[in-house]
Swiss-Prot record:
Binding site for NAD(+): 22-41, 104-107, 189-191, 215-217, 233
Pfam families: SIR2
InterPro entries the UniProt entry points to: DHS-like_NAD/FAD-binding_dom, NAD-dep_sirtuin_deacylases, Sirtuin, Sirtuin_cat_small_dom_sf, Sirtuin_class_III, Ssirtuin_cat_dom
Record PANTHER family: NAD-DEPENDENT PROTEIN DEACYLASE (PTHR11085:SF4), NAD-DEPENDENT PROTEIN DEACYLASE SIRTUIN-5, MITOCHONDRIAL-RELATED (PTHR11085)
Organism for this UniProt entry: Thermus thermophilus (strain ATCC BAA-163 / DSM 7039 / HB27)
Free-text comment about domains: 2 residues (Tyr-66 and Arg-69) present in a large hydrophobic pocket are probably involved in substrate specificity. They are important for desuccinylation activity, but dispensable for deacetylation activity.
One Gene Ontology term, aspect cellular component: cytoplasm
Protein name (database record): NAD-dependent protein deacylase
Free-text comment on the cofactor: Binds 1 zinc ion per subunit.
Signal peptide (UniProt feature, chain positions): none
Length: 254
């Protein structure tokens, strides 16, 4: 309990907060993770669906899989952990601090919950990107895959980062800078195994940030964390960010 109280105190006093989230934060919303016992990669080989080579071989197969995932994402709703991060952002910004949320997730749930200062490191399932002109555009509620670019009419691909691809331009630089400058870093629901995102916690620690991890299982980041909460994202965020009397009176974090 002493470590938890210390973490809460540090968070209340923090001026520069950086947060990294992974698949574990969206699991309570019904979005499957990738690497646990029930994860997507247990039933689907990533080399068959999530590489440029797989798309070049069989774009229809890849799009059919993504259309299924997109439907799952549209059916999902943000959960209390997503909303807790929206509230954390509000608190930090209201006292003149800086806040950046970096997510490895492509489900768009952080944006739907209301997060403003957000970097979607691996893209967004609800967008497509033209293979010819590069235009990004939101996918309509109903579409027949593959979609076509509204600007030039060329076929579009999912606007996500596949294995072997570079991150979106500027995304990594913004994320790295936020974690290097943070005085409080929070890592929620990630195995801390996928680079380069896995290095963000280490960057923050090396720069002197107070580091908190929320994950049911230990990760490579655990030995560095000042506090590791061995629990799910919803429970962990509730422990770390209990509502203040003012928030309860105003209806925040309800």
């Amino acid at each position: 309990m002493e470590r938890l109280e210390e973490a809460r105190k540090r968070l209340e006093e923090a001026k520069r907060v950086a947060v990294l989230t992974g698949a574990g934060i969206s699991k309570p919303s019904g979005i499957p993770t990738f690497r646990d016992a029930e994860g997507l990669w247990k039933n689907f080989n990533p080399l068959d669906y999530a590489t440029p080579e797989a798309y070049a071989r069989d774009p229809e197969k890849v799009w059919a899989w993504y259309a299924w995932r997109i439907q799952k994402v549209r059916e999902a709703k943000p959960n209390p952990a997503h909303y807790a991060l929206v509230e954390l952002e509000r608190r930090i910004l209201s006292r003149g601090g800086s806040f950046l949320l970096v997510t490895q997730n492509v489900d768009g749930l952080h944006a739907r919950a209301g997060s403003q200062n957000l970097v979607e490191l691996h893209g967004n399932l609800l967008r497509a990107r033209c293979e010819a002109c590069g235009k990004r555009f939101p996918l309509p509620e109903a579409f027949a895959p593959p979609p076509f670019c509204p600007a030039c009419g060329h076929r579009a691909r999912p606007d996500v980062v596949w294995f072997g691809e570079l991150l979106p331009e500027g995304a990594w630089e913004r994320a790295e800078r936020a974690f290097a400058e943070a005085d409080f870093a929070l890592v929620v629901g990630t195995s801390a195994e996928v680079e380069p995102a896995a290095s963000l916690g280490r960057i923050a620690f090396a720069s002197g940030a107070y580091l908190v991890e929320v994950n049911p299982e230990p990760t490579p980041l655990t030995p560095l964390a000042h506090l590791s909460l061995r629990t799910g994202a919803v429970e962990g965020m509730a422990l770390l960010l209990p509502p203040s009397p003012e928030d309860q009176a105003e209806g925040h974090l309800s």
